[in-house]
Regions:
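Extended recognition/assembly regions associated with phosphoester-bond processing machinery
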Residues: 1-228
Length: 228
């Protein structure tokens, strides 16, 4: 049977890394996603660069599916929820209604990101810079100074492995057991290799594991076994 989720522990808190890129915390009944970058296509169109305009719908459909599966009490979105400051203001009513449906009966927490520092407009839930739960701190950008128990996004980690004589690069959860950096959840977002200098100092590399999101399962690979 395909391993569509992997159980880990973060500072003693049980967590489930889901193949969609979502993180579920069963003891907190909380689902975490990061870097949705909703309305990215619309943001590019406003600058004269045309992308297919279906990214928001596809991302929200994926989010709805994983929320339906886990039925969490709380959903936390770790920043860069929208691709620019006006995304939530100009978003079509169809997508606004999809978010309202996802939020129905649960708490929705929007963490402010660098793309959307002003928070969200006329959407259910609260907008905050960070939130702490059960010894874990949820914020958008990883902090070198305050790493223990941190769950962050921003960097869109990916990793490269060799499989069947080919190099394969996939988004990943990155964790050493003390800190976790989430993969981006948005369907049109890129990734930054875990060996990039932006990750320097964030993890104890001897304990660092990349949980790669494959096509139909998760692959857990120690940092030393990744391709550079």
């Amino acid at each position: 049977m395909a391993e569509v989720a992997t159980e880990i522990a973060l500072c003693g808190v049980a967590a489930v890394c889901d193949l969609t890129g979502a993180l579920y915390l069963p003891d907190l009944d909380t689902l975490v996603v990061s870097d949705l970058h909703l309305e990215k296509g619309a943001a590019f169109a406003r600058r004269g660069q045309l992308l297919p305009p279906y990214d928001t719908q596809a991302t929200l459909q994926l989010l709805d599916a994983v929320v339906t599966r886990y039925q969490p009490k709380t959903v936390i979105s770790l920043g860069d929820n929208f691709h620019d400051r006006v995304g939530s203001v100009l978003m079509p009513s169809l997508y606004r209604e999809m978010i309202q449906s996802i939020a129905r009966g649960r708490d929705l927490v929007w963490i402010n990101g660098n793309h959307d520092p002003d928070g969200t407009s006329d959407l259910p839930g609260i907008s905050v810079d960070e939130i702490a739960l059960a010894g874990l701190t949820f914020r958008h950008e990883p902090s070198l100074a305050h790493g223990k128990g941190e769950v962050a996004g921003h960097l869109h980690p990916s990793a490269t492995v060799r499989r069947r004589e080919k190099s394969v690069r996939r988004p990943c959860f990155a964790t050493d057991g003390n800190r976790l950096v989430m993969p981006s959840f948005g369907v049109t977002t890129g990734g930054l290799d875990l060996r990039h200098k932006a990750f320097t100092g964030l993890f104890t590399r001897t304990d660092l594991i990349a949980h790669l999101l494959g096509r139909d399962r998760i692959y857990s690979v120690r940092f030393g076994n990744l391709l550079g």
